[in-house]
């Protein structure tokens, strides 16, 4: 029996789970990283799971999009992460917005990203502006914030 089933109160042991814990588990979101164990991770997802799909500098945005499409085909609700430092410019931002709109994705997560040499966007905010101008049709945009600082980003850059 999975921990999710147990927390949802479906334990064979007959134990009760509090309604608050059950709500938390029902609303949880999984995060997938494109690693070697990805196929198994996808297979282990519960039906209709909400899944955040990360965007790594090594794999790129196209991999994030491909993984999102694969998950959408399996009936999952996806939240693609877009790293601004991997976006090539306003045209690319508009293409991403069109893709999000076409796929019916209602939430995205935008970060600055870790790519060392950005092709166009140094920070998340300029990309976010271009992305929104292209009318992606999203209801929610998540973004990264580091109130306690970041190991590799200066305080000045964090304020941008």
PLM region spans:
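Active-site beta->alpha loop and helix N-cap motifs at the rims of alpha/beta catalytic domains
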Residues: 2-160
